[in-house]
Amino acid sequence: DHVMTVNPRLRYHFMNETLRDSFYEAPVWNLGQCKKHTIFVSNSGSPLKGAHQVLKALPIILRQYPDTVVNFCGSSVMSSAVKDILRFQGYHLYLRRLVKKLCLQDNVHFLGSLSEKQMKQQFLDANVYVMPSSIENSPNSLCEAQILGTPLVSSYCGGTSKLLTDGETGYF
């Protein structure tokens, strides 16, 4: 009502998520072609994105599935190159320490920055996509996983409840 008072000719136009082009093209996720017990997390850059939560949960998963691997998009925090170690700060150092503390070096890969095609391939290769964020609006990565048919688990935050139906199109 208030906006209409300011501009009575205002019209609201709904527009679905617009994703990167390659996500609309074949192929789509296939259980027979994915890498068994592989988890993909598309963002590990800040605490709000929750990579640490996945690391903390991984030892529990490893009890049942000891060959589980988690691939994180984002800085290669496990790099042993001196130039990389010197530039790690705050959260990246925390992730590095957490991986070592929980003895997850063989089960965790930080892939660095990925191109659109590399991201798509990670979604296709993963057995499951996990979005552990504490805050989101309308996450494109969740939509990208959905359009490819990748099974997904998401935290319940922000706009995720509008994009995901628990038990049907993914899990909270």
Predicted feature locations:
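Short acidic/histidine- and often glycine-rich active-site loop of Leloir-type glycosyltransferases
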Residues: 157-167, 171-172
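Conserved donor-binding/catalytic core segment of Leloir-type glycosyltransferases
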Residues: 30-49, 55-60, 70-73
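Short hydrophobic beta-strand element within catalytic cores of glycosyltransferases
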Residues: 151-154
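Short alpha-helical donor nucleotide-sugar binding micro-motif in glycosyltransferases
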Residues: 113, 121-126
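Nucleotide-activated donor-binding/catalytic signature segment of Leloir-type glycosyltransferases, i.e.
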Residues: 84-113
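A short, active-site helix/loop in glycosyltransferases that binds the activated sugar's phosphate group
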Residues: 1-14, 19-25, 90
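Short glycine/serine-rich donor-binding loops of glycosyltransferases
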Residues: 139-142, 160
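Aromatic "clamp/platform" in nucleotide-sugar-dependent glycosyltransferases that forms part
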Residues: 134
